């Protein structure tokens, strides 16, 4: 039996920060709306994060070539946020809600653990299985104060995951092939949305689950040529019949095509998200790369390399829409250059996004704003190791 690691860790951080409502400040100061410039449009927050943990891990070879590894950790996690300077209007009158708390404290103690089995089929192939449980501590979002809104919070989420797969290094180390299948469930999952005033908010849903697989292959068919291929498939879904999230709405008008059932609560329009995919979780992703090196007499080498990525259906918000998704996005890159002896330095020319694709990478749904990838970039790079 091998005792791998144990100990106690303590972490604490304290930060006072000033948060500005930059968009409104610029508008007010430029008189875009005919309003008086407001130099008081900021807040000061003091955030204190404290964490204590005790942990241990051990491994035991229960049979020849079969190793069991287990570990446990207990963590205390505390967050506090205090409003030091509230927002004010141009006349100096406080605009933070009088009934809202100016100090919020959240704390939780949770165990984390894992257990795994690894079997060495031969020196080049091993198979494994693993189960683990962890958590993400509570969260306080104090920045809403700059918009004259109360703090928003989310309690701890826990995750239990299962995975199994194999790793291999074959044919004289010329072929490496690894594959894994997995399933995980997140209880009390923390999600992001926006309220009816377009302010960001945090909330908890009952649970979410996901399953899928991933694989990677690296092959060197000849000495100076390396080919790589990787891929993953993923299914995710939120499981909570009672959770709703605000949708894209600006000046009282829903501005995107919402595909989920909706209800109106006050000025907000809410969509039911039960069964929806998690945001930013592509259904599939494939990556390929290739590199050819031409050795030179001085120990350096010339090289030519390329890569490509293909990403499947992805939703960028918790609710289903037509506009806030991407599907089948594609991007490729090329690079050629010279690498010095022992890879001490490299001089190269490169092209990113060779075909100048315009791919949606994210959205700010409360402002109807899109985030796209970079356009085609052509450049020269020089790098070195010291």
Predicted feature locations:
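Outer-membrane beta-barrel channels and translocator barrels
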Residues: 63-67, 122-124, 159, 171-173, ...
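Gram-negative outer-membrane beta-barrel transporters
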Residues: 68, 183-185, 203-318
């Amino acid at each position: 039996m091998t005792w791998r690691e144990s100990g106690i860790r303590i972490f604490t951080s304290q930060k006072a920060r000033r948060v500005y409502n930059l968009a409104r400040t610029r508008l007010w100061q430029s008189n875009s709306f005919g309003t008086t410039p407001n130099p008081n449009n900021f807040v000061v927050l003091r955030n204190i994060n404290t964490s204590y943990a005790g942990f241990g891990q051990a491994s035991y070879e229960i049979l020849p070539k079969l190793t069991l590894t287990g570990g446990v950790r207990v963590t205390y996690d505390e967050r506090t946020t205090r409003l030091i300077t509230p927002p004010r209007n141009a006349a100096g009158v406080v605009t933070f809600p009088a009934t809202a708390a100016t100090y919020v404290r959240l704390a939780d103690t949770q165990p984390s653990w894992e257990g795994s089995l690894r079997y060495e089929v031969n020196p080049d192939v091993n198979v494994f299985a693993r189960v683990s449980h962890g958590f993400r501590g509570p969260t306080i979002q104090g920045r809403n104060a700059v918009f004259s809104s109360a703090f928003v919070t989310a309690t701890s989420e826990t995750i239990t995951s299962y995975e199994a797969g194999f790793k291999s290094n074959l044919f004289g180390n010329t072929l490496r092939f690894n594959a894994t299948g997995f399933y995980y469930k997140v209880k009390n999952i923390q999600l992001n949305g926006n309220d009816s005033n377009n302010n960001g908010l945090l909330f908890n849903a009952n649970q979410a689950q996901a399953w899928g697989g991933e694989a990677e292959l690296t092959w060197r068919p000849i000495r100076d040529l390396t080919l790589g291929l990787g891929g993953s498939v993923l299914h995710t879904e939120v499981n909570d019949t009672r959770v709703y999230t605000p949708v894209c709405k600006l000046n009282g008008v829903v501005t995107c095509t919402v595909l989920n059932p909706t209800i109106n609560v006050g000025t907000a329009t809410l969509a039911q998200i039960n069964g929806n995919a998690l945001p930013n979780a592509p259904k599939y992703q494939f990556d390929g790369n290739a590199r050819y090196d031409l050795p030179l007499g001085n120990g350096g080498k010339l090289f030519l390399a390329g890569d490509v990525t293909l990403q499947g259906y992805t939703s960028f918000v918790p609710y289903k829409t037509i506009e806030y998704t991407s599907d089948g996005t594609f991007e490729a890159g090329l690079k050629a250059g010279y690498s010095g002896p022992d890879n001490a330095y490299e001089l190269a020319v490169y092209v990113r996004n060779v075909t100048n694709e315009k791919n949606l990478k994210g959205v700010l749904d409360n402002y109807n704003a899109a985030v796209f990838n970079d356009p085609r970039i052509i450049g020269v790079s020089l790098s070195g190791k010291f």
